[in-house]
Structures are given as C-alpha cells and as structure tokens.
Amino acid sequence: MPQTLNDILSALQTAGIPFPKTPDYIENNLNPTFELRPYQIEAFGRFLHYLDNDKLRQKPAQLLFHMATGSGKTLIMAGAILHLYTKGYRNFLFFVNSTNIINKTRDNFLNPQSSKYLFAETIAFGDKKVQIRE
C-alpha cells in the first residue's frame, strides 16, 4: 500500500528528523491576537519541509490541510501565502463549496476591521511593506 505524505512526514518526525522552525516573517506578519497552537506550528513545519524538499515534493505541488473545523486552517493558509510570497508567488486562488465560506474567507483576508482578520497591521518583509488585495 502506498504511503501518504502524512505517513512519510510522521515517520520522519518519529525518527527525530526536525522540521523547519516557523520563520519570523510568518509569525511577525500574522495577526498577533492569534497565538499559534502547537499543532499549527507542526503544520507549518510539515508544509515548509515538504515544499522546500525537492526529493519529497511532487510537481505540481498540491497540499491539503486535513484539520478539524475551527482549528485554524485559514490562519495556516495565510502563513503559507506569506511563505510562498518569499518564493516569488503573487497570486493565490481559493476554491470552496459555498458562497458563505468564500465571503467569510475574503473578509478574514482582506478586511482589517474583521475580528478574524489574519494579518498583522503592517505586513513587511524586511524594509518592504506589502498590501493584501483582491
């Protein structure tokens, strides 16, 4: 039976192979009211390990965060976007199965007045400030 990516990453973790630490540019650019939980930090580590490992990564890279409702998947997506921005990506597309979800997600990504706004007040990579726009 073929191993899933989760199986492979779990085996690496069990073998004591460390995953990358969540970079400061992710932590500093996410909304500071949302403290990262241990499993979110692990999700970032797994994401970074997979994305930056040419031997492990399939191309085109396609990932799914299989996490419970309310566990912070959208925050993980925001952090993933921040990382991908450092790799030169500038456009991101979301597919969801309902208008309600896309409207909430849009608000969380684009509206700084939203109680669930995902980013810090200022998003910066070094001296470069970045604006999120639709």
Regions found by a protein language model. Give the residues of each.
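RecA-like P-loop NTPase motor core of helicase/translocase proteins
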Residues: 1-134
